[in-house]
Amino acid sequence: MIIKPRVRGFICVTTHPAGCAASVREQIAYVARRGPIERGPKKVLVIGASTGYGLAARIAAAFGVGAATLGVFFERAPADAKPGTAGWYNSAAFHDEAAARGLQATSVNGDAFSDEIKHKTIDAIRRDLGQVDLVVYSVAAPRRTHPKTGVTHQSTLKPIGHAVRLRGIDTDNEAIKETLLQPATPDEIADTVAVMGGEDWRMWIDALDAAGVLADGAKTTAFTYLGEQVTHDIYWNGSIGEAKKDLDRTVLALRGKLAARGGDARVSVLKAVVTQASSAIPMMPLYLSLLFKVMKARSTHEGCIEQVDGLLRDSLYSAQPHVDAEGRLRADRLELDPAVQARVLELWDQVTDDNLYTLTDFAGYKAEFLRLFGFGIDGVDYDAPVEPNVRIPNLIE
């Protein structure tokens, strides 16, 4: 079938298998050009491994180090001529490329928040890897059903204490709009922490440790985004910020646990990129469009694979990691360059419907958004029929 992009709001409801595969190959090629990652991990578990930063971590570990990988994700398979999700096709392509190079790859498809998927993952580690020496936690989800209580918690994107008016882009109509966000209630804050805080990461590490599948010296990291002044009302001072502070508290306990066996636990702060999650946040399309414009002009623009490849080389497996005062690993240094942030802030209120395409890189933002779903990738013939029914080998469901 011939597959074209169909966008509704912040979701593209179609995906292109060949485009997703080409995107994965592009990321692999980038890692290969950078050369081997010295002293990297050998057996890696990535929780949230099918898109964005999690996929980039799996690619960097496998093709930069030669690591065996086990990926956990929650994706929809193709069925009845309906394409699967982008993460499904990304993972299928990853498996194909890993197999071609003789790299061990296993995947588990299901709800990472559940005890069932944790148990299946532990069984797969025992069978295929024995133990893991790196656990990457890269889960982005709007809701979580707690495995112990059965309660489903829904996260919210709201300020705390007062309403906030945010500028943004109505991406459907390509117009500047303002959104008034009301403050989160205490229950909404607690629910957001339950979904996006550190509890599930801790549950994973506790379960892996109790099962004896964490190697001595194992490291774990959880990916997060903090941002700067423009985004602080939402990301640090809002309901999501409370979840991020919970992540900071959680990592201290995990670090103590792993340090006793020569290991480490860190929160890794990465730069803002286009993801399905970030595109749903009212201000982020405008912020990202401005950030792309400014960073591309300075030749410092990076995507997921550049960020995570650099994180492994320069911090996670470096003798001189980039660490902030709270002990977080920082890969967002170029985004937070004072000159970059000052320019973004200067342009923020100048953007109008008429100059959207000149003051910002909204065109680049839209292109990156479509790339998430396999569209707009160089070398792919989008007028040619493509087979949507792609399977993932070594998949546990």
Swiss-Prot record:
Binding site for NAD(+): 48-53, 74-75, 111-112, 139-140, 244, 273-275
Pathway membership: Lipid metabolism; fatty acid biosynthesis
UniProt-annotated site: Plays an important role in discriminating NADH against NADPH, residues: E75
Binding site for substrate: Y225
UniProt-annotated catalytic positions: Y235
E.C. number(s) listed in UniProt: 1.3.1.9
Lipid metabolism as UniProt keyword: yes
Subunit structure: Monomer.
Protein name (record): Enoyl-[acyl-carrier-protein] reductase [NADH]
Species name: Burkholderia mallei (strain NCTC 10229)
Gene: fabV
